[in-house]
């Protein structure tokens, strides 16, 4: 179980990324030490579990950028992902308030439950957005050998953007994470070795993305390019 990575993921998606010691630069630094593991691909990777604070200590009230970046990373990084129940509906819990709050029942499924999050009408708009996002990623990942078995190559963050590739044979995906609260125009020249075509399908938007000299990313954006 990759507890060090879990610890990092609990806060790096909130920080402004630089090239050395903040935000996603800490992810880069940590994964660069994978040589200490006999087989890092067999590590269990997770955002939280029944013994840790949940990824959200309190339920978010606005955008889900932090959630979307973290979940996309969890499901594309090396290792075997584990998702704790309730993450799909943004269940929150702070270990400082006791372990019981980390293990609250999933809402619904029992007579007398006022809320039933097992059905779409039992989820609020933010929960629906989170559920739909996770569902799309999981359906894509199921049976995807590139993500499950592929090599992991990453680049030191540049201009606040962390880029990594998963590759298996002649198939690959490239993930781009903007670890800042600013829009970025990313120079693609340093990444040409992992960008084998002039365009790629971007999973989350469903759009075809041109890969010319640069690529625009919104604040806290995440892209998953398929080749």
Predicted regions and their residues:
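Short hydrophobic beta-strand that contains or immediately precedes a catalytic carboxylate
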Residues: 176
